[in-house]
Amino acid sequence: MPAITMYTTAVCPYCVRAKQFLKSRGVDHIEEIRVDLHPGAREAMMERTGRRTVPQIYIGDTHVGGFDDLSALDRAGGLDPLLQS
């Protein structure tokens, strides 16, 4: 399973939902980058993703986007192959 990286904050309900969703798909480790705790992390996230909101989710080197994007990817049948790559 590829590494999962997620940019998050402490008070983000979509971050919690994304983590729960990924764990329900068998993901046992998510590297969380807390943009509210680490100086410069939000700017780095915005440079990397082009987005300002959290969560921002990477599966391996693939930028999935936020929770809605993750859900849409799953509905389209693209999440499981990405998790198994």
Predicted regions and their residues:
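Local sequence-structure signature of Cys/Sec-based thiol-disulfide redox active-site neighborhoods
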Residues: 1-29
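Thiol-based oxidoreductase modules, predominantly thioredoxin-like and allied folds used
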Residues: 28-42
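Methionine-biased hydrophobic packing positions in alpha-helices, especially
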Residues: 6, 45-46
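Chalcogenol-based redox active-site neighborhoods
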Residues: 20, 47, 80
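Thiol/disulfide oxidoreductase modules built on the thioredoxin-like
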Residues: 47-53
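Alpha-helix termination/capping residues and helix-transition junctions
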Residues: 24-27, 51, 64
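Residue-level recognition of specific faces of alpha-helices
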Residues: 3, 14, 56, 66-69
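Non-catalytic, surface beta->alpha helical segment in thiol-disulfide oxidoreductase systems
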Residues: 59-85
